[in-house]
Amino acid sequence: MANIKSAKKRAIQAEKARKHNASRRSMTRTFIKKVVAAIASGDKAVAQAAFAAAQPILDRMATKGLIHKNKAARHKSRLSAQIVAMQ
């Protein structure tokens, strides 16, 4: 455990940020899973709606630095391709 006051403060701040980031990361994964589930169900309209909801979340998390911008782009590209390929 830290002994210096500033180190104690940074430890508290780091823990607070870790919890916040974990929550945001979980939310992001949930949105992606909803799109994947909609694609698996075969309903294109539902998949498109879920993708439309997930897209700004991925962009926001990339902007905030929670995930890399290329990772967000990769998720969006792959999900979009799967939706386009649906019958």
Curated annotation (Swiss-Prot):
Locate the region Disordered.
1-26
Q: Which GO terms describe its cellular component?
A: cytosol; small ribosomal subunit
The record ties this protein, via Pfam families, to: Ribosomal_S20p
Instruction: Tell me the keywords, alphabetical order.
Output: Ribonucleoprotein, Ribosomal protein, RNA-binding, rRNA-binding
An annotated Gene Ontology molecular function: structural constituent of ribosome
* Extent of the signal sequence: none
BP GO annotations: translation
> InterPro entries, from UniProt?
Ribosomal_bS20, Ribosomal_bS20_sf
Q: Does the keyword Ribosomal protein apply?
A: yes
On the tree of life, the source organism's domain of life is Bacteria
Free-text function comment from the UniProt entry: Binds directly to 16S ribosomal RNA.
Q: Which family does it belong to?
A: Belongs to the bacterial ribosomal protein bS20 family.
Could you identify this protein by its name?
Small ribosomal subunit protein bS20
This chain's source organism reads Tolumonas auensis (strain DSM 9187 / NBRC 110442 / TA 4)
The beginning of the lineage is: Bacteria, Pseudomonadati, Pseudomonadota, Gammaproteobacteria, Aeromonadales
